[in-house]
A protein has these predicted regions:
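A contiguous pocket-lining binding segment that forms or flanks enzyme active sites
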Residues: 82-120
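Helix-turn-helix
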Residues: 1-17
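Alpha-helical structural segments
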Residues: 17-37, 55, 59-62, 73, ...
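Conserved alpha-helical segments that form or flank metal/cofactor-binding pockets of metalloenzymes
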Residues: 68-71
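Hydrophobic packing residues in well-ordered alpha-helices of helical domains and bundles
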Residues: 50-53, 57, 95, 99, ...
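Secondary-structure edge/capping motif, primarily at the C-terminal ends of alpha-helices
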Residues: 34-45, 78, 82, 168-172
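C-terminal peripheral helix-coil segments that are non-catalytic and often amphipathic
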Residues: 104-208
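Short, surface-exposed loop/turn segments at secondary-structure junctions
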Residues: 41-50, 89, 173-177
Length: 208
């Protein structure tokens, strides 16, 4: 860059401010990659929701594998004294604003799917009361017109996707798998099942 570390602080008020902007830029980069993948899939498939969901998840995995350090900064162990995302929707939090762009790509798919093809979700009285209260709080923060059970399903999908990608990025599948690509396909099939979609057995793209 042709710039010393001290010179960077002429543009940022503190180390945390610098990290916030780095994280925000990274979130914006991921969101752009995912959005482009969704658009390509929608065009190629004529708007098939399974294809769009698969493309979004694959784009997230591909970015994470190509940028493991950046993935670790956003989604790994927080740096001492620094939290990448301070809170959802904080208008004064640059990185939260950028993180919303990232999560918004997945949420937009989820909202579209729910509006076009609602899928079975647990009723409120089938959800643990403590969990239900948290789901309602998160739903209200999103401003989403969804039942709590649908929010639960969204989070279950994210946990599966994030868990699989994290295990692969950080090398925690090496004890059993040299190439986790097919395992990732099984994860996508699980997500599709939760969302009432069919994931064809030949949807996978092989190694890598």
């Amino acid at each position: 860059m042709g710039m010393t570390a001290p010179a960077l602080y002429r543009y940022f008020g503190s180390r945390e401010d610098l990290l916030q902007h780095v994280c925000g830029d990274i979130f914006t980069e991921i969101a752009a990659d995912i959005h482009a993948a969704i658009v390509r899939a929608a065009t190629a498939s004529g708007g098939d929701m399974t294809a769009e969901l698969s493309a979004a998840c694959r784009a997230f995995r591909a970015w994470a594998l190509a940028q493991p350090r950046e993935f670790g900064l956003l989604f790994g162990t927080p740096l001492p004294g620094f939290e990448a995302v301070q809170g959802h929707g904080d208008p004064d939090d640059f990185v939260a604003e950028c993180a919303d762009k990232f999560s918004g790509e997945f949420l937009a798919l989820f909202y579209e799917l729910w509006s076009k093809h609602p899928f079975p979700v647990p009723a409120d009285d089938e959800i643990d009361p403590g969990l239900l209260a948290q789901l309602v709080r998160y739903r209200d923060a999103l401003g989403a017109d969804l039942p709590a059970g649908a929010v639960l399903t969204f989070l279950r999908c994210w946990v599966r996707l994030y868990g699989m990608v994290s295990l692969e990025v950080f090398g925690h599948l090496h004890f059993a798998l040299d190439d986790p690509a097919a395992m990732f396909d099984y994860t996508l099939a699980e997500l599709a099942g939760l969302l009432g979609l069919e994931y064809p057995a030949n949807r996978g793209q092989g190694t890598g």
